[in-house]
């Protein structure tokens, strides 16, 4: 009887500590951009949970970008379109609320550059590029690093634009 009680207590202690560490503690921009770059649906789902710790005024933009990124990884066309539309609404809402936020313009540019033509989400690429270049020096180091990293595979942004 005693061993059963000890076993149950140890089990709950271990389970509680493992589950307690399952959720990331804090939103980090560097981690967000790492997930955006080499995303898997599971990594995106984890980051969507982490975004709940992001500042409220920025949460919609990050969440929208992740949902649109996730849409590109799904198999069913219906799911892809649904996630893309949800993400688009969130990101565009964030841009309307804060039209000078260069980071959100960068996120939109990433999505626009890789979006299929059928979703007709390419109209603001040049506008976003201009705002990103103009505001580059004012962005946080994590975002600047993400932009320069993105330039390596971009047809729109180039490292020379920021010299």
Language model region names:
Residues 34-48, 80-88, 121-122:
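Helix-turn-helix repeat elements of alpha-solenoid scaffolds
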Residues 37, 69-78, 114-119:
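Short coil/turn linking the two alpha-helices of tandem helical-hairpin repeats
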Residues 56, 101-102, 139:
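Residue-level recognition of tetratricopeptide repeat
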Residues 128-163:
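Terminal, low-structured helical/coil segments at or just beyond the last alpha-helical repeat
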């Amino acid at each position: 009887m005693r061993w059963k009680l000890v076993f149950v207590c140890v089990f709950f202690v271990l389970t509680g500590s493992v589950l307690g560490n399952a959720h990331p503690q804090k939103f980090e921009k560097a981690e967000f951009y790492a997930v955006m770059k080499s995303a898997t649906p599971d990594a995106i789902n984890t980051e969507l949970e982490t975004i709940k710790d992001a500042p409220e005024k920025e949460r919609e933009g990050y969440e929208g970008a992740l949902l649109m990124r996730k849409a590109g990884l799904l198999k069913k066309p219906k799911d892809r379109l649904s996630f893309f539309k949800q993400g688009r609404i969130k990101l565009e809402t964030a841009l309307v609320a804060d039209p000078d936020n260069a980071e959100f313009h960068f996120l939109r540019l990433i999505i626009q550059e890789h979006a299929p033509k059928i979703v007709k989400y390419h109209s603001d690429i040049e506008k976003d590029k201009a705002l990103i270049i103009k505001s580059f020096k004012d962005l946080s180091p994590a975002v600047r690093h993400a932009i320069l990293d993105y330039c390596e595979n971009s047809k729109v942004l180039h490292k020379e634009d920021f010299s």
